Amino acid sequence: MPKVTVYNQTGSQVGEIELAEAIFGIEPNEAVLFEAVMMQRASLRQGTHKVKTRSEVRGGGRKPWRQKGTGRARQGSIRSPQWRGGGTVFGPTPRSYAYKLPKKVRRLAIKSALATKVVENNIVVLEDLVLNAPKTKDMLAVLKGLTVEKKALIVTADANESVELSARNIPGVTVITADGVNVLDVLHHDKLIMTKAAVEKVEEVLA
């Protein structure tokens, strides 16, 4: 079982915690991580692209000239696809790009992402994270005590408004709950900061 040092909010070591081998100790599966990231990014796409077909563009109801006798090519509408200003054939239409991987694959991807942070030594476990009032200064002090200088993902067991508001104005810092742990957020941030309660909750869900 991987062992990780537990810190308090000031950055002092207060003990150790054994992380679940089946979650944090597995060998990361890069192929599954790739698939999970692609799935999440696909679901973030707006998909609002749209062009007009010949039935939607304005005009073109009348035949521009008679069928025979002009010497020109026959035309039925000035909004046919070959005309300037005509409709588009097989153009993009609004659609959802979202799709889902099998549940087992999604769970393996989250485990692999968490295990990656352990392998890289980029996981920090906090005994607890309590802020009496939403103050950015207090959150910066916590991060400074933990010597976190890059992008950090903070995972709490439950929603904590003071923590969320305190981190909101700090570039590169994101706060989520244990229920919302996902592959894209874990891999996108350099450091993963979890409270002990959040670790227990994640292990309970993914066990």
Swiss-Prot record:
One GO term describing the cellular component: ribosome
Basic residues: compositionally biased ranges: 60-71
GO MF, one example: rRNA binding
GO biological process, alphabetically ordered: translation
Entries under InterPro entries matching the protein: Ribosomal_uL4 (IPR002136), Ribosomal_uL4-like (IPR013005), Ribosomal_uL4_dom_sf (IPR023574)
Keyword line: Ribonucleoprotein, Ribosomal protein, RNA-binding, rRNA-binding
Gene3D superfamilies: 3.40.1370.10
Region span, Disordered: 45-89
Annotated Pfam families: Ribosomal_L4
Role: One of the primary rRNA binding proteins, this protein initially binds near the 5'-end of the 23S rRNA. It is important during the early stages of 50S assembly. It makes multiple contacts with different domains of the 23S rRNA in the assembled 50S subunit and ribosome. Forms part of the polypeptide exit tunnel.
Description of how the protein assembles with itself and partners: Part of the 50S ribosomal subunit.
Family: Belongs to the universal ribosomal protein uL4 family.
Stated name of the protein: Large ribosomal subunit protein uL4
Annotated organism of origin: Bacillus cereus (strain ATCC 14579 / DSM 31 / CCUG 7414 / JCM 2152 / NBRC 15305 / NCIMB 9373 / NCTC 2599 / NRRL B-3711)
